[in-house]
Every structure is written in C-alpha cells, then in structure tokens.
C-alpha cells in the first residue's frame, strides 16, 4: 500500500535522522533542501519501523525509473531524481555511501546509475508487440527537472503548480552556510548543471480550499478576490500548519488569529490572502536568489 508524500508518517523524520548524522553533514554532501518527504527520510522511516517490504526489497526504483523498467526491462537509477531524493553527493554526482549505509542500503539496492541522455535500453518484445513499435531505444530523461524556454542564462524560473519551484540554473552546487540556513536545494540538472532553487507551497492552498468549497470556478473566485481589501491578512505559505490540514480554510483562519491579523471570512478574502501571501513569498525568495546566484538575475520566467 503506497503512502502519499504528505502522509504524516514522516513528521519528525529529518530530526530523527539528524540525531545520527548531523544536518550540516547531510546538507554538505547533498545540498538538498530538508523536507519531511525526501526519499532519504521516507526510507529511514521505513527502516526504523521495520517495514517488511523494505527488508525484502532487492532493488529500489524511483517512479521515472520504474517507467523505464516497464518499457525496457532494465533497472536504472537516473541521476536527477536520485539527487532530489537526497541520496546523491552534489560534488561527485554519485550515490553517497555514508547515507545509504545509515538507512541500511547499499549500491546493490539500486540499478545502474545513468545520466540524462544516456541509453537505457530498447523496448521489450512485449512492449513492441502491444504498441506495434520496433526496437525503439529508450533514452534516460531528467526524471525530476522543470523545463523552461530561455534565450540566455541570466534568468530565474518559477514553476507554479501545487508546489511553486523558484530557482536558477548554475554550473556547480552552491552549498554554503547561507544556503543551508535558507534551506535552498541544489538539484541535479541536465548536461552537468545544477538547479539552485527553493520549494515553496504553491496552489495547494487554493486547491484544498476549492475542494472544501465544492469546486467553485477559479474565474468566480478571482473576481470576488479582486473586490476585497488588499493586504488585509497575510500568511506564511510554508508554515507547517498548511502541509496537510484537515480543513485548509480553517487553517488559514487559525494562522491569522494566532498572529493577531484580521480573520478572512469570505471566499474572496481567503483567495486574496492566498494570492498576496504567495506573491510576497516569491519576492522574498527571488531576493535571496539574487544574492546567492553566481550570475545576475535579469528575468523571471513563470511556467505552470
């Protein structure tokens, strides 16, 4: 039975892991933003809970690698998704043995390590028969990379969805005391690049509210929000309160009450609070990126 990545079974998992290996060591190796649901902490949680599936596992495949396996019969571990999992050393671009050892795994539990652009194999005979295709080669793609069209390299991107990913592309990891303090991530990219970015809670806030409200059309909510007083109430979208609350509208109201702000009462006020809070958070992260990036940030590309 699979877990949702927002399942509370990993609450406190990073802190439990850091009692054995200091956070500074883990970040120094991986450069990855510490989040409860990183695969490193999920696997460690399974290990601590004596999970029978993990104990019996011969190979571990990330979702993109599982799809490649279904197509080719070849078990591989693709670099970018393994990097995001917080299992890769950002400087060697290989799985970090010290982390694997701590969660009771070895290199043998993972498939052949591949990078974007490498050939994984060809379609299996069964897939060829089902699809009518021939022995088409299957090439490894970046299993966890947001793409953005750009004419030059002096840009930042904002991939806006359930999560908002804001970052820049760099030629090498940026792993410093400041990036660790700000909890920025250095995810492996294509052609030797690194994506220095921050994961921000995005439209999850609005999606959950809409679910509670009966899927009111976005257009109606936006019009109503436009009639409301600006900057009346603001939240920190990344507060743990909003990770997976039983009721998102109530969580927003609770936050505003706790911080002695006017409590948003109407749908429009709540939507305006969400949008303005996200916009301010984006501005805050963009300012940090300008200071951290080795190149000037001259444009922001927003995709979704």
Which role does the model predict for each range below?
Residues 77-83:
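Helix-loop-beta segment of a Rossmann-like dinucleotide-binding subdomain
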Residues 2-9, 83-87:
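A charged helix-plus-loop insertion that forms the helical arch/lid used to bind
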